[in-house]
């Protein structure tokens, strides 16, 4: 049992061990199964890898075989290349041999040709020298022939003068003796031959005696007139001549007007003799500024005729002429007296008063484009047409009777005739579009004026919405009609001067830019036909067909409104060469009388040229060498023309734009181009022009050259115009240098001249001009804080006093030894009071206000004062007192109502217009005074003279 029990225990133990062993075997079998699976996976991976490697090995073997094949081919090609190289070396050696042979042959040929060329050059040089000698001899012969002809003409003229002088000597011996200065008033002669009698009848003798007119060229007219005035001047002031006063002064005015019309050069000797008389007359005119207009006007004419404007300041000169802006020769007076700077103010004043004819005279004389509405003179004529039409309605009424219509037509004809006269006298036809000039001629000839003005009026209305100047005119037109035009002066014909013989008016010709001519005749002439132009539709068809030519474009640009330039743009786009078309349209070179000489001529107006250039600039055309060459040649002649006369600033701007568009700016010096245009135009009219021309970098050098050459004041104007103040600091030092250098030079000339009064006066004048220019520059650029303007004004007064003493012969003492002593004293002198400076301030009356009149008076005063005073307003007879008197003296009251004045009878031909001047006048700013203005209306006066 124990054995069995032990045996069972062993069996149990064996079971447990077996179970454990079985469990361990089961666990091992599971891991073995996993290993078997992994092995199979590894075996399959290795099999695939081996297959891939075998394939790659096969590919490598195939590649190796192909490389071996290619290596064999390469060896074969290397052998072929070696063979080719050997053949090339052989051919190269052969080529070098042939090249050497060719060089030898070429050198031999070149030597041969060189010898032939040298022989030809020697022959050509010899021929040129012979030709040059022959040309010089021909020129010398031509010059001798010309000199001989001139001498023959001079001899013939001298002989004619001698014959004419001998023939007229006996006839005019009494007149010459009366006019001679050395005879004067001491000559014993009959009563009717006295100096007073001569002055009373001087206008008839000078104007109506044709024999005297033939004799004047053989004398010195300036000396004759001076002697005649000087001989009667003292007698005029000593005696109370009563009604003969006006006749004496009128005779002086007649002589001075004729002298100014002759445009003679006054000799220094005559000018020196006229200076004392000018000083004396100027003093009398200042003292009688308000009470004696004829004397004031005569003084202004005398100073202008003899070039004595430097005797006083510009302010005093302005007070002399400001009352006579409606005088026919007022622009010429401004030019002769050196008042060009004040012209813009005068024009603005006339425009405000709607004195369009007087405005037209100034604009044509000085070419003032920028003062026209919108910068276009054509707009001014359109406003003139409108004003003339309204004035005609005021004169003739709004009725439809035949008499009223005839009166309106006569008024329009007279205004148009006067406008054409002013344009022709100033040679300003190119300023205005041809269409408006033709319409003006139509109105003058009375060819259905209303129908003729319809196209112009429509064009004007289209431009009203875009032009500022027209906006102002619209504002003015809102004033009630009766209030604005109640004082129109009916002047239908120009007064005939006593010296002019009444003759039949011959047809005249107005030159228009298109090359055509419009005939003008007297007021009674009625033309049969009116020149017409192709219609706008026909012109457009020609443009669209691509057959635009220069004459067609020229006609189109003259007819085209300046704001509607679509047709012009299309015309330039249709042509294959816009630049060439522009040259043919706008300009040309005309041969002159001299051999090989040319003269530049504009075929269109400056405004039309500017319009075409703007369109051409937008197109940016490609300009070929032939066209550019033509442009260079035209530019050279154009610049010469502008350099001779720079009156048309718009033409200068067109020239500069022309250079930039055609790319020929480099053909001219930058300093020359910058100096063509006034400094004010660079920034105001065309601010981007300098950049367009590429002249920005040249501006500092240009200004520096102006300073080096002594034009310092002008340099300062350019400094401010181009904004170069930061590069030329301080500006005040430049002004001080200018004054210092001018003063030193003048003092040196004064000392060296010793007792030569003419040279001393010239030195003083030079210093006075420098001081006035400096004062103007300081005021313009607001530099008053850096200078004492009062000291500069005192220096000018002291210099003028020294000048008077020198002219009178009393400046040879201490003044001549120390010319600057007067200036040093003036710097410490007490400043003048307001009353003392009144003659050069704003209390001098302005010209009569004729606000609605469209025609200007040809004479600034009346010969018959007594008759004119019958209708004067109350207060006219007040004593003058001091010039700076109360302003009420200039505005006397009256008791006439508007309706009463409108009922006064009007003679459309012989009426004058007078008014009272403006006491609030400012020398620096022209403008109308605030408050009411009073006028004399339609006084019956002698048409030859007008009473103020």
From Swiss-Prot:
Chain ranges passing through the membrane: none
Skewed-composition ranges (Basic residues): 861-872
Record's signal peptide: none
Sequence ranges of Polar residues compositional bias: 818-830, 873-894
Keywords for the protein's UniProt record, in alphabetical order: Coiled coil, Developmental protein, Differentiation, Flowering
Residue ranges with Low complexity bias: 807-817
Positions in coiled-coil regions: 47-164
Basic and acidic residues: bias regions: 459-475, 518-527
One Gene Ontology term from the biological process aspect of the record: cell differentiation
Tissue: Expressed at low levels during seed development.
Region (Disordered): 447-500, 518-538, 804-894
Record bears the keyword Coiled coil: yes
Family: Belongs to the Frigida family.
Protein name, UniProt field: FRIGIDA-like protein 5
Source organism of the structure: Arabidopsis thaliana
Source taxonomy: Eukaryota, Viridiplantae, Streptophyta, Embryophyta, Tracheophyta
């Amino acid at each position: 049992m124990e054995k069995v029990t032990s045996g069972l225990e062993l069996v149990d133990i064996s079971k447990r061990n077996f179970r454990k062993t079985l469990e361990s075997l089961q666990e091992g079998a599971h891991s073995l199964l996993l290993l078997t699976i992994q092995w199979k996976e590894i075996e399959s991976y290795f099999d695939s890898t081996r297959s891939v490697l075998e394939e790659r090995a096969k590919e490598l073997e195939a590649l190796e075989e192909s490389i071996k094949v290619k290596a064999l081919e390469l060896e074969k090609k290397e052998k072929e290349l070696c063979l080719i190289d050997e053949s090339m070396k052989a051919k190269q050696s052969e080529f070098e041999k042939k090249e050497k042979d060719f060089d030898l042959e070429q050198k031999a040929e070149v030597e041969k040709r060189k010898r032939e060329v040298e022989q030809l050059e020697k022959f050509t040089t010899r021929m040129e020298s012979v030709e040059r000698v022959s040309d010089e001899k021909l020129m010398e012969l031509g010059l001798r022939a010309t000199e001989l002809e001139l001498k023959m003409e001079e001899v013939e003229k001298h002989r004619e003068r001698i014959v004419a002088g001998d023939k007229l000597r006996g006839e005019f011996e009494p007149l010459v003796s009366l006019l001679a200065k050395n005879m004067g008033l001491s000559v014993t002669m009959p009563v009717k031959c006295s100096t007073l009698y001569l002055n009373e009848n001087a206008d008839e003798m000078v104007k109506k005696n044709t024999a005297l007119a033939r004799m004047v060229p053989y004398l010195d007219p300036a000396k004759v007139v001076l002697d005649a005035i000087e001989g009667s001047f003292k007698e005029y002031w000593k005696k109370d001549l009563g009604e003969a006063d006006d006749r004496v002064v009128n005779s002086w005015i007649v002589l001075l007007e004729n002298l100014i019309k002759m445009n003679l050069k006054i000799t220094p000797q005559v000018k020196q003799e006229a200076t004392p008389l000018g000083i004396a007359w100027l003093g009398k005119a200042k003292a009688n500024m308000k009470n004696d207009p004829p004397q004031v006007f005569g003084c202004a004419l005398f100073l202008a005729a003899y070039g004595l404007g430097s005797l006083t300041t510009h302010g005093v000169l302005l007070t002399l002429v400001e009352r006579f802006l409606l005088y026919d020769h007022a622009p010429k007076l401004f030019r002769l007296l050196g008042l060009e700077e004040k012209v813009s103010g005068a024009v603005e004043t006339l425009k405000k008063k709607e004195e369009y004819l007087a405005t037209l005279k100034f604009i044509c004389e000085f070419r003032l484009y920028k003062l026209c509405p919108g910068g276009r003179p054509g707009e001014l004529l359109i406003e003139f047409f409108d004003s003339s039409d309204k004035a005609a309605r005021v004169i003739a009424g709004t009725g439809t009777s035949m008499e009223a219509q005839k009166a309106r037509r006569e008024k329009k004809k007279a205004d148009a005739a006067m406008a054409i006269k002013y344009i022709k006298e100033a040679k300003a036809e190119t300023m205005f579009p041809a269409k408006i000039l033709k319409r003006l001629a139509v109105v003058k000839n009375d060819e259905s004026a209303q129908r003729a003005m319809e196209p112009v009026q429509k064009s004007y209305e289209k431009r009203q919405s875009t032009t500022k100047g027209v906006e102002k005119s619209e504002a003015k037109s809102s004033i009630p009609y009766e209030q604005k035009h109640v004082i129109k002066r009916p002047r239908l014909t120009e007064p005939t001067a006593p010296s002019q013989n009444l003759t039949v008016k011959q047809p005249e010709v107005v030159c228009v830019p298109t090359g055509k001519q419009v005939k003008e005749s007297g007021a009674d002439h009625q033309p049969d036909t009116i020149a017409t132009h192709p219609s706008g539709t026909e012109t457009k068809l020609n443009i669209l067909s691509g057959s635009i030519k220069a004459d067609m474009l020229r006609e189109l640009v003259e007819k085209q409104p300046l704001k509607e330039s679509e047709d012009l743009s299309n015309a330039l786009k249709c042509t294959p060469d816009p630049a060439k078309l522009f040259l043919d349209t706008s300009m040309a070179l005309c041969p002159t009388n001299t051999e090989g000489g040319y003269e530049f001529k504009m075929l269109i107006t400056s405004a039309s040229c500017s319009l075409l250039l703007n369109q051409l600039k937008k197109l940016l055309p490609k300009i070929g060498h032939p066209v550019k060459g033509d442009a260079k040649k035209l530019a050279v002649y154009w610049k010469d023309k502008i350099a001779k006369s720079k009156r048309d600033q718009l033409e200068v701007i067109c020239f500069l734009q022309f250079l930039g568009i055609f790319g020929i700016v480099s053909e001219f010096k930058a300093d020359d181009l910058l100096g063509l245009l006034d400094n004010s135009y660079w920034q105001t009219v065309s601010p981007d022009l300098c950049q367009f021309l590429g002249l920005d970098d040249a501006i500092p050098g240009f200004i520096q050259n102006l300073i080096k050459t002594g034009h310092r004041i002008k340099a300062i104007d350019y400094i401010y115009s181009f904004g170069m103040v930061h590069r030329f600091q301080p500006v005040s030092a430049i002004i001080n240098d200018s004054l210092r250098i001018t003063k030193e030079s003048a003092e040196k000339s004064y000392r060296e001249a010793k007792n030569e009064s003419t040279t001393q006066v010239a030195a003083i004048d030079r210093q006075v001009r420098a001081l006035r220019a400096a004062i103007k520059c300081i005021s313009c650029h607001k530099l008053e804080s850096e200078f004492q303007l009062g000291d500069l004004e005192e220096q000018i007064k002291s210099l003028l006093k020294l000048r008077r003493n020198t002219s009178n012969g009393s400046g040879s003492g201490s003044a001549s030894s120390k010319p600057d002593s007067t200036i040093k004293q003036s710097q410490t002198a007490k400043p003048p009071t307001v009353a003392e400076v009144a003659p050069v301030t704003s209390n001098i009356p302005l010209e009569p206000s004729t606000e609605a009149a469209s025609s200007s008076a040809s004479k600034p005063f009346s010969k018959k004062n007594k008759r004119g005073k019958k209708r004067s307003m109350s207060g006219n007879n007040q004593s003058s007192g001091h010039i700076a008197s109360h302003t009420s003296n200039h505005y006397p009251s009256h008791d006439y109502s508007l309706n009463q004045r409108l009922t006064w009878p009007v003679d459309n031909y012989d009426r004058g217009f007078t008014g009272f001047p403006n006491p609030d006048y400012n020398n620096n700013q022209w403008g109308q005074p605030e408050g009411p203005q009073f006028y004399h209306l339609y006084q019956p006066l002698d048409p030859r003279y007008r009473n103020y």
